[in-house]
From Swiss-Prot:
Its main location: plastid. The keyword Kinase does not apply. One of its GO terms (cellular component) is ribonucleoprotein complex. Keywords: Chloroplast, Plastid, Ribonucleoprotein, Ribosomal protein, RNA-binding, rRNA-binding. InterPro entries: Ribosomal_uL5, Ribosomal_uL5_bac-type, Ribosomal_uL5_C, Ribosomal_uL5_CS, Ribosomal_uL5_dom_sf, Ribosomal_uL5_N. SUPFAM superfamilies: RL5-like. PANTHER family: 60S RIBOSOMAL PROTEIN L11-RELATED. It holds the Pfam family Ribosomal_L5_C. The keyword Phosphoprotein does not apply. Part of the 50S ribosomal subunit; contacts the 5S rRNA. It comes from Oedogonium cardiacum (Filamentous green alga). This is Large ribosomal subunit protein uL5c.
């Protein structure tokens, strides 16, 4: 099944961007490469239950199995040993990426209380965008009764654009609600 946002990209966004930036080749048009969802869990080293519930929640939200990230070296001030679980990461590409982006834009972000839009200043110098969400309850897959602990996540949308302006316009065309 072709995702709605992928179809929107091919039929309307690509021609708009080609006209606006005067691209000669369709392959010059920026696109979304991947979406990385990350959740750091500082308390995971003490409790396996928090790690397991976080892993299951992220898998449910993303629709794909994630990877448990582990510490690379020991840091005494954080009471952290080497190779201890410190978070969960899911990388989405292709159809699942477009499906997640669609759910995030149309279902999750509007459910945030007092939502004014997302900050347009969170782009890196290559046109990729990162945002942090404070809780997982905004996603329709989450049920309040089944959540052990409310914790946020970081979402990075990696694009092929080379400039911030290109990335911003690309994500605006997809429907990401940026603040004015």
């Amino acid at each position: 099944m072709k995702q709605r946002l992928k179809q929107l990209y091919m039929e309307t966004i690509v021609p708009k961007l080609m006209e606006k930036f005067k691209y000669k080749n369709i392959h010059q048009v920026p696109r979304i490469k991947k979406i990385v969802i990350n959740r750091g869990i500082g308390e995971a080293s003490q409790s396996n239950k928090i790690l397991e519930s976080s892993f299951k929640e992220l898998n449910l939200i993303a629709g794909q199995k994630g990877v448990i990230t582990r510490s690379k070296k020991a840091i005494a001030t954080f009471k952290l040993r080497k190779n201890v679980p410190v978070g969960v990461t899911v990388t989405l590409r292709g159809e699942r990426m477009y499906g997640f982006l669609d759910r995030m834009i149309n279902l999750a972000l509007p459910r945030i209380r007092d939502f004014q839009g997302i900050n347009p200043k969170s782009f890196d110098k290559f046109g990729s965008y990162s945002l942090g969400l404070e809780e997982q309850l905004m996603f329709p897959e989450m049920e309040y009764d089944k959540i052990d602990q409310i914790c946020g996540m970081d979402i990075s949308i990696v694009t092929t654009s080379t400039k911030i302006e290109e990335g911003l316009i690309l994500l605006k065309e997809f429907g990401l609600p940026f603040k004015n």
